[in-house]
Amino acid sequence: MSETKERKLPAPAVSAETQAYWDAAAKGKLLVRKCTSCGQAHHYPRTICPFCFSDKTEWVEASGKGTIYSYSVMRRAPVPYAIGYVTLAEGPRMLTNIVDCDFDKLKCDQAVTVVFKPTDGGPPLPMFTPA
């Protein structure tokens, strides 16, 4: 079953810590945080590195490419949708929606690319579609 109608998406909460992330999303760019102490990239973007707890992190533009790690299709919703974990080419894994596809043809390890979907009064949300 493919997504035939668009779901109304609530606007994300934007804080001073995530403002750059959402500003980039509005320009169609996906950012991750990278720790300059241990070299690990992470998502959801936050100032403190979850690996070494350093506060020496910087914004890095991600390629927008990844693979599906795991997913589930929610068919009981008014508009069916797929939610899953995508492993980004840069390493971090993010919880996201998989959109604009036939949900019955999704599979783990499938290549995906980022798309940005509008929200109700806020910045767009990064989601993924099969590449």
Regions found by a protein language model. Name each.
Residues 93-102:
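Beta-strand/loop nucleic-acid-binding surfaces
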Residues 33, 47-50, 107:
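Cys/His-enriched microdomains
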Residues 66-68, 98:
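Conserved hydrophobic positions within beta-strands
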Residues 101-113:
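Short nucleic-acid-contacting surface segments enriched for D/E, G, S/T with interspersed K/R
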Residues 36-39, 53:
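Cys/His-coordinated zinc-binding microdomains
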Residues 118-131:
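OB-fold/S1-family single-stranded nucleic acid-binding modules
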Residues 29-32, 39, 46:
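Residues immediately within or flanking Cys/His clusters that coordinate Zn2+
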Residues 1-30, 130-131:
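A broadly conserved sequence feature marking short terminus-proximal activation segments
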